């Protein structure tokens, strides 16, 4: 019985992922995929004149002609 309880606790910890990571879209140029972000923050960066946004982990600063949206949920930068 103790072994079963211990197994359930381990499975729960693995499934809940207590590391506070989130999944973000990651895109540079034409390829798009997901990645696990340890920072817990995703971003979408849109540069004026560019047809596709850049996406990834973290939250870079915006600048003139560049709009950056940061968020903290799974796949929120899509």
UniProtKB/Swiss-Prot annotation:
Tissue: Expressed by the venom gland.
Claim: Secreted is one of the keywords in the record: yes
Regions crossing the membrane: none
Chief location: secreted
Compartment(s) of residence: Secreted
Paired cysteines (S-S): 24-42, 37-57, 59-70, 71-76
GO molecular function, one term: toxin activity
InterPro entries tied to this protein: Snake_toxin-like_sf, Snake_toxin_con_site, Toxin_cobra-type
Signal peptide: 1-21
Keywords attached to this entry: Disulfide bond, Secreted, Signal, Toxin
Example of a GO cellular component annotation carried by this entry: extracellular region
Family of the protein in this entry: Belongs to the three-finger toxin family. Short-chain subfamily. Orphan group XII sub-subfamily.
Name listed for the protein in its UniProt record: Alpha-neurotoxin homolog 7
């Amino acid at each position: 019985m103790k072994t079963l309880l211990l197994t359930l606790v381990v499975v729960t910890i693995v499934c809940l992922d207590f590391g506070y990571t989130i999944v973000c879209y990651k895109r540079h140029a034409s390829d798009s995929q997901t990645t696990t972000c340890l920072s817990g923050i995703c971003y979408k960066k849109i540069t004026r004149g560019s047809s596709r946004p850049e996406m990834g982990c973290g939250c870079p600063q915006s600048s003139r002609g560049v709009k950056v949206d940061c968020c903290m949920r799974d796949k929120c930068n899509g």
